[in-house]
A protein has these predicted regions:
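Extended hydrophobic leader/signal-anchor segments used for secretion and membrane insertion
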Residues: 1-103
Length: 103
């Protein structure tokens, strides 16, 4: 089971979820161990600059939407971290951060 599987399942039911991601790729916006509250979202409902829980090439990230392309069910988003890295394009967006409580 992956670090965010439980949150992804909760978001899929239409409920909010809380995660505590670890790592430094989103500093200073999200610090390692922060409590992040997510609301359900998908690629069509997020905008550039949103912090989202998503899957890119089989990996789950809590990263930024860097760009969008397309519309409706064909819309996809470019995901990257807060330090200049880019993960790639995806349609697999599960949630958007609505509250971040850094330690």
């Amino acid at each position: 089971m992956g670090w965010a599987d439980s949150a992804i399942e909760t978001l899929r039911t239409g409920s909010k979820a809380v995660i505590r991601p670890h790592g430094g790729s989103m500093r200073p916006r999200v610090l390692s161990g922060a409590e992040v509250t997510l609301e359900p979202a998908n690629a069509s409902s997020v905008e550039v600059g949103d912090i989202v829980l998503c899957r890119v090439s089989g990996n789950v990230y809590l990263h930024l939407v860097k760009a969008t392309e397309g519309a409706g069910p064909d819309r996809r988003v470019l995901i990257g971290n807060n330090r200049g890295g880019v993960n790639g394009w995806t349609k697999a967006v599960y949630g958007r951060a609505i509250e971040i409580r850094n330690p």
